[in-house]
């Protein structure tokens, strides 16, 4: 029984299957953690969702910003962009089933036995574990409810960007969603900066990566995140693991075997990397919420 953690898949099914074959993944015995952004940019978003769903309880995943964007597109709230390559998913006969499964997935995973926390973008320095759990549950509750289109319509926006327990309603949900799925940089007080998408060494002062600020999360817990492909998994402190290594941009799909902290990688298949890089958008470009 092994625990495997994999970074953002972005519709790259062939690379995912090749990577799982490297470690002889057995869904009957092993557990697979996924950092979110299962869909968009790669060629096989539909088949990725079908495959991950078929794994049932063997999977512990979180939603990423591209997954939320897919939900918004399917609900008629956001526009389907050709570069996301999700039209086959939207037109699939089982699209309703897949979308309803996807919107019931969590935005946060916490395992108290393994001392593991996973969120697509990370954990804001303004939250401790209990606050993160509470805010994640609130987002998950509205996503799984019949009123989820109202939330999806309101989630786009960068404000508020400063946590307060006094936040309520859609403003509170938007902050939580941004913190869990879009965050990269923070100001020294922990306030989110939703504009800069550069590498840490090129970010303007006083911005710092969220993981370089003092955190309220119990240091016994390790934090797993994806989302930030340009990091290439490097430059993070001990106990923080960035697993998005840009497979859909021609980089790697990365797996971390938690039992012995050993990394495995699968290089992107060249043809797909060329398609994305020739479409005129930068590696790691994010969906704008």
UniProtKB/Swiss-Prot annotation:
EC number(s) recorded for this UniProt protein: 3.6.1.41
GO cellular component, one term: cytoplasm
Segments traversing the membrane: none
Record GO biological process: RNA decapping
GO MF annotation: an example: phosphatase activity
InterPro entries in UniProt: ApaH, Calcineurin-like_PHP_ApaH, Metallo-depent_PP-like
One of the Pfam families matching this protein, by short name: Metallophos
SUPFAM superfamilies the UniProt entry points to: Metallo-dependent phosphatases (SSF56300)
Reaction equation(s) it catalyzes: P(1),P(4)-bis(5'-adenosyl) tetraphosphate + H2O = 2 ADP + 2 H(+)
Keyword Hydrolase: yes
Residue ranges that the Swiss-Prot or TrEMBL entry lists as coiled coil: none
Domain of life: Bacteria
Enzyme type, top EC level: hydrolase
Keywords: Hydrolase
Function text: Hydrolyzes diadenosine 5',5'''-P1,P4-tetraphosphate to yield ADP.
NCBIfam families given in the database record: apaH (TIGR00668), PRK00166.1 (NF001204)
Protein family per UniProt: Belongs to the Ap4A hydrolase family.
The protein's name in its UniProt record: Bis(5'-nucleosyl)-tetraphosphatase, symmetrical
Source organism (scientific name): Yersinia pestis
